[in-house]
Amino acid sequence: MTHRNSRQDTKELKPIADIAATIGLSEDDIEAYGRYKAKVRLEAISRFHSRPDASLILVSAMTPTPAGEGKTTVSIGLAQALARLGKATIAALREPSLGPVFGMKGGATGGGLSRVHPVDDINLHFTNDFAAVESAHNLLSAIVDNSVYHDNILNIDPRKVTWRRVLDMNDRFLRNIVIGLGGSVNGVPRETGFDIVPSSEIMAILCLSRSYRELKEKIRRILVGFTYDDSPVMAGDLKVEGAVTALLKYALLPNLVQTTENVPAIIHGGPFANIAQGTSSILGTDLALRLADYVVTEAGFGFDLGAEKFFDIVAPYGGLNPRIVVLVATVRALKYHAGIAQADLDRSNPRAAVLGMANLRKHYQNIDKFHVSCVIALNRFSSDTDEEINAVVRAAENEGMNIAPCDIFRLGGEGGLELAEKTLELLAGTSCGYRRLYEWNQPVEDKIFTVASEIYGAVSIDYQPLARRNLDLINKYGFDKLPVCIAKTQQSLSDNPGLLGLPRDFIVTVREIRIASGAGFLIPITGEILRMPGLSKRPAAYSIDIDDSGNITGVGSPGGISSLS
C-alpha cells in the first residue's frame, strides 16, 4: 500500500527503507519508526566515517518578519533542485518544537511542494527526541533539589541554583515560579522557572555530541549552581550523568525522513537560534556529509543569530567546513525593513522593497567576514509582483551581489533550479576554509563586543550589575575561554526588536551571562530576550484538529513558513 502525501497529491512517499537504500544504508543500519521515518544506528555512522566530506551549504536569512521568510522551505527546495540536477543531496535540518507549532508560526516542515514528510508526525512528537531531552533535563533538576533536601552534603546554596526546568510549550506563566511550598515535607522553597526545551543545555549538548561517551562527559560538566562560598557545583558532583545520558540513548541517533520529491532528509535536534546555537546536530550533519555529495543545512533566524553561531561555535566543535551561504530574502521582509506596516506588506511597492535592502546588504557583508561565498535566494511569495522581484534583482546585481529568485513553495525543486545552478557555480570557484570571527582565548568582553560590533553594528556594550558579577565568576573559575552564544531578539540586528532596517549608533545591553559549561559556551542574555516564549492572542492551536479517522488538520505551517526560521 502506498501512502499519499496528505498536503500535495503530486508525489508518493516511499518506504523509509527505500530512501535509506538510495544513500547506501541497509535495513540493518536503521531502526524504523513506522513506515516513513527511522533512526540511523551509531554503528552505521561509524562505518561511513572514512568517506570524504560533501560540500556543505548553509542556508541563512536576512532579519525576518514575525512570520518568517521560508528558510526551511528554501532549504528543502534547494535540496530537491540539486537532486533534479543529478547531484546526490541530503537536507540536514532541525526538529520542530511543540511551542511554536501551537504558537504563532505553526509547523516547521517547510511548505507547498517543498516539505519534509510525514508532516504531522514530524511536527507532533516525531521520534520523541524532545520528550527525551525534557525528561533528561528535568531529572537533573529533580536531583539538584533532592540533594538540597536530603542533608545537602554538597553545600548547595538554594538561592544560587542556576539549573531551571524545561517544558516544550510556550507558557509565559512558568517563566518565574516558586517551588517547595507547603511545608518541609514538600522541599525547600526557592524561586526558579521554566525555559522552553530548545533552550535547554541538554539539547545543545545532544546536538554537539558524537557518541555516548562524549554525551555523558558533557553532561558531567554541566554547571547546576554554586555553594554558599560561591564554588561551582557540577552535574558530575551529583553522580547522575549516567542516568541523564541513559534517557538520551535513542535521542542521540539521527532521524531519517524524506522530502516531497523523495530526497533524503536527516532531521535531528532543535535548539533555537535566538536563545541557543540554532542548528541541527553535528552527528546528523556529519552523517549526511558522508552519504551525499551536497548537504543543505540551515541556521535559525537571521545571519546575525544562527549562522554566526554556526561559524563560531558549531563548525569548530563539529569539524564542519561550510563552503557557501544561501541567504534567504523576501520582498515582504525588504518592505518591512523599509518601514511598511505588516498590514500593507501584500501591496505592490517596488520602491520600498529596494529601500529595505540596507538590512539585506548588512547580512551579505557580514558573510564576507567569514571568508565564504554567498548567493541571495529571493524567495517568492504569492503576493509578490514581477515588478518588485525585478527591482530587487536589478538593485542587488548593480551592487555586485549574487542573487537568484526562486518559487520553491509553488513549484518545488523545479522552482529552485536557477538557485541551485548559481550555488553550484559559486561552489566550483570557492576554496575550502572559512575564518572564525574571534579566537576563543580572547577575553569574554572582547568576544561579545566583536560579535556585537562586527555583526550587529553596535557601538558599545552596557553590562548590567548581574552580568558583571557573572563575569567575575566566569573569569575566576576558568570559563572565560569558552565561545559566546549571544541570546538576542531575532526581529532586529540590535537587541531592540523595534529597530528595523539597519540600526545605527546603538548600545547592546547584557543583562546576565549564563554558563553552559557542558555544551561549551557562554550565553550573554541581551535586551528583553526570554528563554520561555508566550502564546499569541490567536495561537495556531486554535486551527489544529483531528477527525474521527485520525486525520490531523492545521499542523502544516501557514503559507509554508517554518516555525524555526
Curated annotation (Swiss-Prot):
Biological process terms in GO annotation: tetrahydrofolate interconversion
Please give the pathway this protein is involved in: One-carbon metabolism; tetrahydrofolate interconversion
Q: Which PROSITE patterns does this UniProt record tie to the protein?
A: FTHFS_1, FTHFS_2
Q: Which residues take part in binding ATP?
A: T65, P66, A67, G68, E69, G70, K71, T72
What EC number(s) are associated with this protein in UniProt?
6.3.4.3
Leading EC class: ligase
Instruction: Output this protein's name.
Output: Formate--tetrahydrofolate ligase
Protein's gene = fhs
